[in-house]
């Protein structure tokens, strides 16, 4: 894409800015692997970053820092009990190196419109993890096409789509829909060790280690 940041402003950030309240009302349940990941790796000493926290639905333990680009969703997240809420961009995380024991990235990087930007975000999340730290990554998989109304994103790859919101043709979000092979390749190319991976409904997840 010729202007990926402009494309994401139009088909990602604008969507969440204009629809944050309605969207947040439909996103109250945390994704299933999130609880299992925290049960396996969280301790009372852990500091956790939710990078792209949305409305805070993954705030399941103490000492969680929530970061999101959308101010409307961050306002909703205040009620969910995050220790600290920060407006920021996953492409340039506002944290020093090796700050966190655990990182969550739930339904975030599939909104980045080029492979280079997705890998950059992954490397940023790896940067802020402590050595040996763990990360849970979730993305939408290609099977999501069977459940929503998608159209191909002009100028993108065969995995780049625009999805309508509540069947409103004038409101669309961008997604890069992953296959498992491509997701795991991204993880290893970004310097992570893959500990586990699988599927949950139309989504794919990977448990990673720095």
UniProtKB/Swiss-Prot annotation:
Signal peptide boundaries: none
UniProt keyword terms in alphabetical order: Methyltransferase, Transferase
GO molecular function, one term: tRNA methyltransferase activity
Pfam short name (any one): Methyltransf_11
One example of a Gene Ontology biological process annotation: methylation
Catalytic EC class: transferase
Name used for this protein in its record: Putative methyltransferase ECU09_1500
Organism whose genome encodes this protein: Encephalitozoon cuniculi (strain GB-M1)
Higher taxonomy: Eukaryota, Fungi, Fungi incertae sedis, Microsporidia, Unikaryonidae
């Amino acid at each position: 894409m010729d202007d990926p940041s402009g494309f994401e402003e139009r088909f990602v950030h604008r969507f969440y800015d204009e629809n944050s309240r309605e969207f947040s009302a439909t996103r109250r349940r945390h994704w299933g692997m999130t609880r299992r990941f925290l049960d396996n790796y969280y301790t009372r000493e852990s500091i956790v970053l939710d990078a792209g926290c949305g409305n805070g639905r993954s705030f399941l333990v103490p000492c969680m820092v929530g970061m999101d680009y959308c101010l409307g969703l961050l306002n909703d997240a205040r009620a969910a009990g995050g220790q600290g809420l920060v407006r920021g961009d996953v492409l340039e995380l506002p944290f020093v190196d090796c700050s966190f024991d655990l990182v969550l990235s739930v339904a975030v990087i599939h909104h980045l419109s080029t492979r280079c930007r997705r890998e950059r975000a992954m490397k940023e999340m790896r940067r802020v993890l402590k050595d040996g730290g763990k990360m849970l990554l979730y993305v939408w998989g290609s099977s999501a096409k069977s459940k929503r109304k998608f159209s191909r994103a002009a100028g993108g790859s065969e995995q780049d789509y625009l999805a309508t919101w509540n069947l409103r043709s004038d409101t669309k979000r961008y997604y890069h829909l992953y296959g498992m092979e491509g997701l795991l390749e991204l993880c290893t190319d970004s310097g992570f060790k893959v500990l586990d991976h699988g599927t949950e409904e139309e989504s794919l997840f990977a448990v990673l280690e720095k």
